[in-house]
Amino acid sequence: MPVAAQKTDIPELSTSVLPGYVIGAMSFIKHLRIKRAYEEPAHDDGVRILVDRLWPRGLSKPRARVDLWLKDLAPSSPLRRWFNHDPARWAEFRRRYARELDAKDRAIAALRGAVRRGRVTLLFSASDPEHNNAVALHAYLARRRTV
């Protein structure tokens, strides 16, 4: 499939990324995107899944066009408050969040079902596009080959 490659901002996915596919060991994560909830919905977003525990501040439900809100995939409130979007805590946040995700089989199964049907966009509300739970969730799924 001759498609131009693009670079990803996710450290675990430092290989080139093709739209819809990650080259090499990550090829099982098909059609999975990450997008800030405040960005305009696009026709090719597929199923839009909010993975935050709290609804994005100031964003109306009609404007967000969220198809599924998987609060159970969000970090626990204590972990979210501890992390406080501090990049210095990113590595430890990801470790702790992965431990929480290990116990969330039902929510992972719901996400898996959506991904198997086609394109999925994980939505987050944090202002930092590189240090947020959607990026950590995507990396977790890639490492565990869960989707």
Where does each model-flagged region fall?
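Serine residues within intrinsically disordered or low-complexity segments
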Residues: 14-16, 27
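Polybasic, lysine-rich low-complexity intrinsically disordered segments
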Residues: 7-8
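Residues lining hydrophobic/aromatic ligand-binding pockets adjacent to catalytic sites
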Residues: 21-147
